[in-house]
A protein has these predicted regions:
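Phosphate/ribose-recognition catalytic cores of enzymes acting on nucleotide-derived substrates
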Residues: 150, 201-323
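Short histidine/acidic/glycine/proline-rich micro-motifs that form metal-
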Residues: 33-35, 65-67, 100-102, 129-134, ...
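Short beta-strands and strand-loop turn motifs
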Residues: 29-31, 61-62, 94-98, 123-128, ...
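Active-site-proximal cofactor/substrate-binding loop regions of enzyme domains
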Residues: 49, 56-120
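Classical nucleotidyltransferase
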Residues: 105-211, 290-294
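Positively charged, low-complexity intrinsically disordered leader regions
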Residues: 1-26
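N-terminal catalytic cores of NTP/NDP-binding nucleotidyl/phosphoryl-transfer enzymes
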Residues: 17-73, 78
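Residue-level signal for inorganic ion chemistry
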Residues: 37, 86, 124, 184, ...
Length: 323
């Protein structure tokens, strides 16, 4: 999958001049796609089917998160996590725009200058609530109508319902804030996760007999409430169960919020390796223990509960094949 960063007019012109899209055009799926949740997946699936039917590439039109979120707003996925998920759904190309570059375009300029001239869009696929153009003046119905006038096509994907109602990134964040991880997993299509490289910690867990994997939480990424979680760590295509503390490790008076994971039944060096950490269930809040011995006792209690949960969870229903 090709990824094109379009932050300036020069980037846009270079993309148009140097990118060899099919003469027959492309199917363009439009959206921010934060979380790439089940509603996004349904939209992209329809776009992919259309691209295969027409034998033309599937192009994702999206934005850099930093340029399109309000100040202080957190996102479910980093840009890199989003791109990984989009590739897994069959996208041939992702065009990532700086929102400031196009926010002042009229709705017709967006359609004609960006979608038609620059991307050579044959068919645009958008959600029912897609808005575009300066002041969000354009909607999905207008896009469909205007493309038809230009001998192109627009497809509108209706509202996707899941769980107790509509699926959205806002709904998923609310569930995660309440530690309703299973409910959020059904809406995301897989458990909430963090991708990143394992960093060197202080070695405190190792000294206690519970060596841990430490990962930072990107500042722009939505973070779960502090506490201890039953997790699954993916390393080199293999899955390992774990206990993860999200927080500051108050027993040892650390400061920055991060994740610290004790991997069950694992031996090996994972420092500096790229891993994915899935959050399965919340076990308890973060506690400051009066001694290392108390902490060790609690870790053993947490481990026992994690092993019980493994038997209770329907893993395939949340997109993981844990044996």
């Amino acid at each position: 999958m090709q990824i094109f960063s379009i932050k300036t007019d020069s980037d846009l012109n270079a993309f148009s001049e140097n990118t060899k899209l099919s003469d027959s055009g492309c199917v363009c799926a439009l959206g921010f796609f934060d979380g790439v949740h089940v509603a996004h997946r349904a939209l992209i699936s329809e776009a992919k089917k259309e691209a295969v039917r027409l034998s033309i590439p599937l192009v994702i039109f999206t934005f850099f998160s930093q340029s399109s979120l309000k100040s202080g707003q957190k996102r479910l996925f980093t840009d890199e996590e989003k791109f990984t998920e989009l590739e897994g759904l069959g996208a041939d190309m992702v065009t990532v725009f700086n929102f400031d570059l196009i926010k002042n375009l009229s709705k017709d300029e967006f359609i004609e200058d960006i979608l038609v001239q620059k991307l050579n869009t044959h068919t645009a696929v958008s959600g029912f609530n897609f808005r575009f153009g300066k002041g969000a003046s354009g909607n999905a119905e207008y896009l469909e109508k205007r493309l038809a006038a230009l001998n192109r096509r627009g497809i509108i994907i209706p509202e996707y319902k899941g769980g107790d109602g509509a699926v959205s990134s806002t709904v998923i964040k609310a569930l995660l804030s309440e530690n309703k991880l299973m409910e959020s997993a059904f809406l995301l299509g897989k458990p909430y996760f963090i991708d990143g490289a394992v960093k060197h910690g202080l070695g405190l867990g190792k000294n206690l007999g519970f060596p841990t994997v430490n990962m930072d939480i990107p500042k722009e990424k939505f973070s779960l409430p502090n506490g201890v979680y039953y997790t699954v760590l993916e390393l080199s295509g293999k899955l390992f169960e774990g206990l993860t503390n999200v927080g500051t490790c108050p027993t040892f008076e650390e400061r920055e919020i991060h994740t610290e994971t004790f991997i069950l039944n694992f031996e090996g060096d994972v420092y500096d390796k790229s891993v994915r950490l899935y959050f399965i269930e919340h076990l308890r809040g973060e506690i400051k223990f009066s001694s290392a011995e108390e902490l060790i006792m609690q870790i053993n209690v947490d481990k026992k509960r994690a092993l019980e949960l493994k038997k209770e969870i329907q893993w395939q229903e949340i997109g993981l094949n844990l044996q």
